[in-house]
Amino acid sequence: MISTGIAAQNRKGRFNYTILETLEAGMVLKGPEVKSLRLGRATINEAYAGDRDGEIWLFNSYIPEYQGGVLSRFETRAPRKLLLHRKQVDKLLGAVARDGVTLVPLDIHFNARGVAKVTLGIGEGRKKADKRQAIADRDWQRDKARLLRNKGRE
């Protein structure tokens, strides 16, 4: 059971997109959805956030049915409303109006009070060359750390 910490993470989100800014939003969830999230079985790899009637919603996130209860029937891929202030919604909708910018859910976590939150990133899609450069940079950082770690042993 996860009382605080990350319940689901979109690991490809930071790789496929250059994240310009992050924002934390609350989620409207039912009881069995929260229990299922606390078990850590949710996935947001194909999820995205978008506009519906002037509000921000999370689409295509997968929260499996909670197996512990009898009345735990809910749609696993239902759109879920995100709770934001009006100024934040206007800012996000203005950012998404630009070409090539999208809202990427980066993780779902429980804060210190045990409330489910989703971290949204305003991201621009990366080209294939940018992804290759990111891989090369990551490999160089790993090799550099290995060289520094082994330097004293020689």
From Swiss-Prot:
This is SsrA-binding protein. GO terms for biological process: trans-translation. One of its GO terms (molecular function) is RNA binding. Keywords: Cytoplasm, RNA-binding. Gene3D superfamilies: 2.40.280.10. One of its GO terms (cellular component) is cytosol. Signal peptide: none annotated. Belongs to the SmpB family. Required for rescue of stalled ribosomes mediated by trans-translation. Binds to transfer-messenger RNA (tmRNA), required for stable association of tmRNA with ribosomes. tmRNA and SmpB together mimic tRNA shape, replacing the anticodon stem-loop with SmpB. tmRNA is encoded by the ssrA gene; the 2 termini fold to resemble tRNA(Ala) and it encodes a 'tag peptide', a short internal open reading frame. During trans-translation Ala-aminoacylated tmRNA acts like a tRNA, entering the A-site of stalled ribosomes, displacing the stalled mRNA. It is found in: Cytoplasm. CDD domains: SmpB.
